[in-house]
């Protein structure tokens, strides 16, 4: 696609955004956008890599009827803190849990303060480009956030100290030579164990004689020390890594295989999930509520729900043998789909509701799911359930669809870390677009009581 074609496509999407902006806000419990103002010297070009993550902090102003929810926003090597102003009471799960009447929100003064504030970097990972952040607020090591750069280096940041207090550095590698073939899509990821004592970091293969690797990093005693390095031969990169608990973590690589690893067990996976149907597997997530529930997403837009016990039973004997055999002989519990076969790039379970999940498409669109209707059917007809659900049930499970008037599709940057899902405020989501526009919203799902069942869904 030529530069002129891209410009024309973006122009059309901007016009669609203007139409959406006028008509759609009624489908949200709350939605607001902010274009931050930065001090001099900040690189604001659309090609600059951006990522966002919510903190766990919040502060309320009862007289104004508003809640301030901080968001960390990385742009290039710098991290900024942005106050997101939302209505007081948005953090309540149900209206009946509100103990006293709430003041009608007055955004004027509070929003203007935020909009007119010139942001200066709170932290800086000098000489690096930040790809992802994890908010930890770990009092034991006195660290607020850990940042991963595009070449696999790590930085630990402390409140009130602009430079990292700890680092784990990797040799500099030109993004243009990355095996992913796209300078805007560095294939690095990291994760933290449930007890916060261990980090895992991936590094992609750059030369023919190299392997993609996983490093286990100390996050409690000798912070930043490499505990183990695991080479993963036969692949170019690992696009996602997550802990299932303190001892087991899993990876998803460019060959579409999910590998499960033990913290202290050898250099081969314990089990694998090799699912080649519905496109290549691109991402995964494990439920924080049900330890047997596991989800994967594919390049063809399928979101699959698995019983991890079946995966373990199949892959327990010889993981490497199963890789060579191709598709695993295990079936998912059920599957649903993104619109227009949009690739599933990220899956995130709610930490509040066991049935709710947010998924991110390859174009940046955000899907909100509530699988309560599916599991209700599954429990009723468990013996006869074959993993195939009706179109009506799938539509009911998709609670909300956020496109920002197709604005989320503008730009070529990796969209995986441009969406943040709040840990404690149900359904609160933030997005950052390629031009730096921040949007914070909580969807109105359109559900109304109909006897004992809730029906309806909203799309935007």
Swiss-Prot record:
Keyword Chaperone among record annotations: no
Keywords: Chromatin regulator, Cytoplasm, Meiosis, Nucleus, Repeat, Repressor, Transcription, Transcription regulation, WD repeat
WD repeats: 233-271, 276-316, 339-379, 411-451
Keyword Chloroplast: no
GO biological process: cellular response to heat; chromatin remodeling; meiotic cell cycle; negative regulation of transcription by RNA polymerase I; negative regulation of transcription by RNA polymerase II; nucleosome assembly; positive regulation of transcription by RNA polymerase II; regulation of DNA-templated transcription
SUPFAM superfamilies the UniProt entry points to: WD40 repeat-like (SSF50978)
Cellular localization per UniProt: Cytoplasm; Nucleus
Protein name: Transcriptional regulatory protein UME1
Native source species: Saccharomyces cerevisiae (strain ATCC 204508 / S288c)
